[in-house]
Amino acid sequence: MPFLELTLSCSEVTLPRFQNALDDVGAMAVTMLDANADTSNERALLEPGVGEMPLWDRLTMTALFDGGSDALVVLAALEAFDPGLDWSQVGFRMVEDSDWIRAWIDLFKSMQFGARTFIVPWNQDVPEAANAPDAAVVRLDPGLAFGSGTHQTTALCLRWLDSLAVSGELQGRSVLDFGCGSGILAIAALKLGASHAVGVDYDPQALLATADNAHRNALEAQLAVYMPQDEPVQTYQVVVANILASALSTLADTLAARVVPGGRIALSGILHGQEDELLERYAPWFEQLRCERDDEWMRIEGVRRAASGTQNG
């Protein structure tokens, strides 16, 4: 039976709060390890005295959830339970064994988004509909990184990119994919006519998956990947951020600064009911703000105001 595995780093001080949150949202098991294990800073814990609980200064917590759990829903529930904690660098993956992971990918089928965009697993034939001259075919191996097109948040972004391409607003444009996961959005944008793209993610596994998928699509020369702290400070004509509402709010200044005047932005990973706060948060920088809903998830899109009309956020 597969499980959804969550990992995070915390301190001895914040451990009880993280543990309470994980228990509240239904973690089936929680384990703790020294975050400095296998390094020169590893610290051995000897037999504790009576009434003492031995803990390291920094810990890596691992929690298991039912394999049918939605990682984004779990993360949203954790943020709602204790919004004062930093959930921005939580990692998720499906675990059991590599055979199960490959079996899941074998079940992943070709999908179409909008008029021209097709996501096709690397090990399957291109469907007949994707042979049209203007079709944008993305060959994908999602691996362990989030973003295969099957989740509503990703689908909302793919349809948005497709609509930009249809209206001619993606051709030759520069693209930032913040929270790139498997690289599906950056690669789709390039296939739809963007000139170059940058993928940013906190998870090194995501950057590896993005680079691998860029290679599968012969786009490695047009797609660069970075950890957030390493990303060059520059602006883009199109920015898409498929993360979560709390991170979108925190990063509003950063993301707004990445969009050129007149450029387009799409924000996804937003649960229905969270959109009003984000619309207000991004209004100082963006106009023509509108929402689209897919089940319980929302996408916000907008156009960057001209430089003379910007405000401080």
Swiss-Prot record:
Methylates ribosomal protein L11. CDD domains: AdoMet_MTases. Belongs to the methyltransferase superfamily. PrmA family. It is an enzyme of class 2 (transferase). It catalyses: L-lysyl-[protein] + 3 S-adenosyl-L-methionine = N(6),N(6),N(6)-trimethyl-L-lysyl-[protein] + 3 S-adenosyl-L-homocysteine + 3 H(+). This is Ribosomal protein L11 methyltransferase. Coiled coil: none annotated. GO terms for molecular function: protein-lysine N-methyltransferase activity. GO terms for biological process: methylation. S-adenosyl-L-methionine binds at T154, G179, D201, N242. Its main location: cytoplasm. Its EC number is 2.1.1.-. Keywords: Cytoplasm, Methyltransferase, S-adenosyl-L-methionine, Transferase. Pfam families: PrmA. The keyword Cytoplasm applies. The keyword Cytoplasm applies. GO terms for cellular component: cytosol. It is found in: Cytoplasm.
